[in-house]
Amino acid sequence: MKTLYSLRRFYHVETLFNGTLALAGRDQETTGFAWWAGNARLINLSGKLLGAHVAHAGLIVFWAGAMNLFEVAHFVPEKPMYEQGLILLPHLATLGWGVGPGGEVIDTFPYFVSGVLHLISSAVLGFGGIYHALLGPETLEESFPFFGYVWKDRNKMTTILGIHLILLGIGAFLLVFKALYFGGVYDTWAPGGGDVRKITNLTLSPSIIFGYLLKSPFGGEGWIVSVDDLEDIIGGHVWLGSICILGGIWHILTKPFAWARRALVWSGEAYLSYSLGALAVFGFIACCFVWFNNTAYPSEFYGPTGPEASQAQAFTFLVRDQRLGANVGSAQGPTGLGKYLMRSPTGEVIFGGETMRFWDLRAPWLEPLRGPNGLDLSRLKKDIQPWQERRSAEYMTHAPLGSLNSVGGVATEINAVNYVSPRSWLATSHFVLGFFFFVGHLWHAGRARAAAAGFEKGIDRDFEPVLFMTPLN
């Protein structure tokens, strides 16, 4: 067995499989990890680990740029975005780029610019990643002490945490500045069916912003996912950005308190588990937001929410049958409840039929027809506008239900379009990835705690069959 020439480079977990495969000192015998353990080989090589992370960022940004350009190349302006399987252009449109009244795309050039900028950025990151992975110093502590670190150094770790928090705060303020000063963002609630507007009257009242956190997560309340005006969303980003930046400064200037030093595990794997746990929470919240919220994720770009498509179907048939002479205020359905309209448990007038369970829905095309006690019968008889009929018919046939083979929409709706809503994709992918990240959090937390407690033995490798087999190479 080769001698360990640097104790700093050895991290004790035995995973002997193929000890002959050496990669410039990043082999199993010098690190304790085989090649397939990936970045675990670099736990104590801050320079190489930097290269791995920068290269990873390059791959992420390359995907964003390439996928962005792919969507631009395939985009058909005459069709809604959600019918074209797009997941990136809706985000750009929501930020107010390239769209006009009603969410109509009037200019695709900003989308092209976005893709090109991401591609160029990915090239810079890719170069930096390759440089630090192959050519740069193995460890940063000696040459660049500011960027160097030891995982056990609690003070340095909280400083790094602080820097990350400040960067997140700056990111939150970028959205604020876009909404306030740089052209505004798309507001699905703008009169007449949505438009891009500057957000001038921010909600900064802490009772409103933090009131969302205290709401019940169940129907009618909906926790933070129930936010339905952009003033609250942008005001929330002012609060969040400020908290992140102030918290970042705090963590840079202070050392961890004694209780934190005792309570937390201070190792690279522990920090990995904390991060995975946080990302899992983000994934679950994003899943709920994209599935239920049609303000942060406007239906013009992402397609209707499930409740929205269901209510749209009830509204469409109310309009049709009312024109054919039905008295929608008193007609009885097959169950004896109102066929078109009924009362909610708390007395509001709501749509009848199966969609009664979605009576919580708020949507820009429906709210003008509500009065102080729910849906207003006189408005339903006299005030329905053509744009509301068109939009509800469109949403009725584009329910965000579907399978991987693209058989989309409500199974019983004969006019449903064969597509899968980006809402389905984004909600499902974030739920699944959030779950995987949560499992990763549990796994790495367990390993980190075991290592800290001193009973991390690994498997006894002395008599493992694979050790007596001929090496693959």
From Swiss-Prot:
Bilayer topology annotation: Multi-pass membrane protein
Localization of this protein: Plastid, Chloroplast thylakoid membrane
Cofactor comment text: Binds multiple chlorophylls and provides some of the ligands for the Ca-4Mn-5O cluster of the oxygen-evolving complex. It may also provide a ligand for a Cl- that is required for oxygen evolution. PSII binds additional chlorophylls, carotenoids and specific lipids.
MF term (GO), any: chlorophyll binding
Chain positions with N-acetylthreonine modification: T15
InterPro entries membership: PS_antenna-like, PS_II_antenna-like_sf, PSII_PsbC, PSII_PsbC_sf
UniProt modified residues of type Phosphothreonine: T15
Annotated positions binding [CaMn4O5] cluster: E367
Residues of the propeptide: 1-14
GO biological process: photosynthetic electron transport in photosystem II
Main localization category: plastid
A Gene Ontology cellular-component term: chloroplast thylakoid membrane
Membrane-spanning segments: 69-93, 134-155, 178-200, 255-275, 291-312, 447-471
Keywords (A to Z) from UniProt: Acetylation, Chlorophyll, Chloroplast, Chromophore, Manganese, Membrane, Metal-binding, Phosphoprotein, Photosynthesis, Photosystem II, Plastid, Thylakoid, Transmembrane, Transmembrane helix
Subunit structure: PSII is composed of 1 copy each of membrane proteins PsbA, PsbB, PsbC, PsbD, PsbE, PsbF, PsbH, PsbI, PsbJ, PsbK, PsbL, PsbM, PsbT, PsbX, PsbY, PsbZ, Psb30/Ycf12, at least 3 peripheral proteins of the oxygen-evolving complex and a large number of cofactors. It forms dimeric complexes.
Record family assignment: Belongs to the PsbB/PsbC family. PsbC subfamily.
Function summary: One of the components of the core complex of photosystem II (PSII). It binds chlorophyll and helps catalyze the primary light-induced photochemical processes of PSII. PSII is a light-driven water:plastoquinone oxidoreductase, using light energy to abstract electrons from H(2)O, generating O(2) and a proton gradient subsequently used for ATP formation.
Protein known as: Photosystem II CP43 reaction center protein
Species in which this protein is naturally found: Solanum tuberosum (Potato)
